Amino acid sequence: MESISQLQPPMGVNFLNIAPTYIPNTKVECHYTTPFGMKRSTRDWIGIFKVDTSSIRDYETFVWAVPPESSGERSVSHCSVQFQAYYLPRPGEQQYHFRYVDQYGSVRGCSDAFVFGEPRPMEELVTLEDEDSCMDMLLVVPKATFLQNQLEMAQQERNDLMRARLALEEEVILKEKRINHLEATLETSEKSCFSLKEQCQDLVMREQLAIEEQSLLSCQEAELRERILQLQGEIKIMNKKMQEKDRELEGTVAIKLSLENKKVVLKQHLAETTVEIKRYQLQVDSLREKLRSTQDMLSASQQKALLMGEELAAISSIRDRTISDLHKSRLETADLAIKVSDLSVKYKEGMGQWWQEKTALNHSMEAKRDQIVNLKAEKLSLENSLQAERSQRQALQCKLNQETDARQVQLSENRRQLSELKSALKVAQMEKQQLREERQGILQYARSLEERLDKLADELWKEDKMLMEEITDLNPPTLPVDHSDSDDESPGDERVSQQLEACSLDEQDLTINLPGFPCELYKVVINQPAPIACQLQPLPEDNSDSW
C-alpha cells in the first residue's frame, strides 16, 4: 500500500489542460510534461483514481506512459495518452484525478480533480446579422454552434500562424546552418592564413639566416681578401728576397768567377813556382854534383895529403880556399833548402786554402740552390693555394648569388600570397560582419514574430477558454447517443475534439521540431476533451559573445 504522501514528489509530472468535467462514452486525452532529469521507462503508467484513494492498486483504469523516441533525461518532454471510452467510470458526482506512477510504484505526479457528467442541453441562442447579403436578415443559431465556428476559425488562424512560425524557424535554421558553414569556411581560411603566416615567418627567419650566412660569407670573403693581400705581400716579400738571393747568387757567381780567376792565377803562380822549384832543384842537383865532385876531389886531396904529406904545406893555401868554397857551397845549399821548404809550405798552404775556399764556395752554392728551389716550390704552393681559394671564393659567390636569387623569388611569392590571403581574410571578415548583421536582423524579426505569436496565442487561448466555458455552460437539446459501440462519441464533441487534437498535434510537432529554442513551461488549465494552448517556446536572446 502506498500512502498519499507519495502523491507530490520533488520532481513531479505536470498535467496540463485538465477540464473540470468530462463527457462519458467519449475518449479522454490526458496531456502532461516530465521534468528535467527524470528517468522514464516503458513500465510507467497513468491511471484514473478516485480522489480519496490512497493505494495505487485501487485504480479505475490505466494506460501505459510510453516515452517519445526523441526525448531524453536532460530535456522536458510534452506527452499525451488517451483513455478509451468503454474503460471510463460512470457519470456521477464522484471526483477523480490522474496519477503518474513509475516502474517502481512511486507516484510522480497527480492532476486536478474532475468529474464525469452528462452534457446539458444548449438553451442559449445567438442572433447574427447576414453581412454578405444586402437583405436585412437575422440568423438565429445556437450559441454553441456559433462558438464552435469561432473556435474553428481561431484554430485555423492559429494553425496558419504556427505554420508561418515553423517556416520562419526553418528559415532561421537554414540561415544558422549557412552562418555555421561560413564560420567553418572562415575558420579554415584563418587556419590557412595562420599556416601561411607561420610559413612567412619561417621564410623571414630563413631570410635572416641567409642574410647572416651572407654576412658570414662576406666576413670570410673579407678575411680571404685580407689573406690574399697578406699572401700577395708575402709573395712580394719573397720576390724581393728571391731578387736579393738572385743578386747574392750573382755576387756569389762573381765571387766564384773571381775565385776561379784567382785559382787560375794561383795555378799559374804554382806552375811558375813549380818551374822555379824545378830550376832550384836542378841547381841543387848541379850543386850536389859539384859537392860530390868536391868531395871526390877532397877524398883525392886527402889521399893526396896522405900520399903527399909533404905537399901539405904547399897546398894549405889551396886547401883553405877549397874549404872556404865548400863552406860557401854549404851555405848556399842550406839557403836553397830553406827556400825550397818555404816554397813548398807556401804551396801547401795555398792549395789547402784554395781547397777550403772551393769547398765552402761549393757548399754555399748548393745551399743557395736548395734555398732557391725551396723558394720556388713555396711560391708555386702559394700560387696554387691562392688559385684554389680564388676558385672556391668564386664558387661560393655563385652559390650565394643563386641562393639569394631563389630566396628573393620565394620571398616575393610568399609576400604576394600573404597579400592575397590578407585581402581574402578582409573579404571573409566583411562577409562575416554582413552575415552577423543579417543574423541579427533575422533574430530580431524572429523575436518580433515570436512576440506576435505569443500575443496571438495568448489571445486565442483566452478566447478558446471563454468559448469552452460558454460551451460547457450551455444546455443543448438532448443529443442522441448511440450506446451500441462504446468507442463512438457525440458528433459535435467529436468534431471539436478532432480539431483540438489536430491543434495539439501541431503544437507537439512544433515543440519537437524546435530543439534549438529552450522553452519555459506554463501550466495552462483549460477545458477538455483536447488542449487549446500549447507550450510556447520563446526564442533565446542573441548572444553576441557566441560569435
Swiss-Prot record:
<keyword id="KW-0175">Coiled coil</keyword>
<protein>
    <recommendedName>
        <fullName>Calcium-binding and coiled-coil domain-containing protein 1-B</fullName>
    </recommendedName>
</protein>
<dbReference type="GO" id="GO:0045944">
    <property type="term" value="P:positive regulation of transcription by RNA polymerase II"/>
</dbReference>
<dbReference type="InterPro" id="IPR051002">
    <property type="entry name" value="UBA_autophagy_assoc_protein"/>
</dbReference>
<dbReference type="Pfam" id="PF17751">
    <property type="entry name" value="SKICH"/>
</dbReference>
<keyword id="KW-0963">Cytoplasm</keyword>
<dbReference type="GO" id="GO:0003713">
    <property type="term" value="F:transcription coactivator activity"/>
</dbReference>
<dbReference type="GO" id="GO:0005737">
    <property type="term" value="C:cytoplasm"/>
</dbReference>
<feature type="region of interest" description="Disordered">
    <location>
        <begin position="473"/>
        <end position="498"/>
    </location>
</feature>
<dbReference type="InterPro" id="IPR012852">
    <property type="entry name" value="CALCOCO1-like"/>
</dbReference>
<dbReference type="GO" id="GO:0005634">
    <property type="term" value="C:nucleus"/>
</dbReference>
<comment type="similarity">
    <text>Belongs to the CALCOCO family.</text>
</comment>
<dbReference type="Pfam" id="PF07888">
    <property type="entry name" value="CALCOCO1"/>
</dbReference>
<comment type="function">
    <text>May function as a coactivator for aryl hydrocarbon and nuclear receptors.</text>
</comment>
<feature type="coiled-coil region">
    <location>
        <begin position="356"/>
        <end position="469"/>
    </location>
</feature>
<dbReference type="InterPro" id="IPR041611">
    <property type="entry name" value="SKICH"/>
</dbReference>
<feature type="coiled-coil region">
    <location>
        <begin position="143"/>
        <end position="305"/>
    </location>
</feature>
<keyword id="KW-0539">Nucleus</keyword>
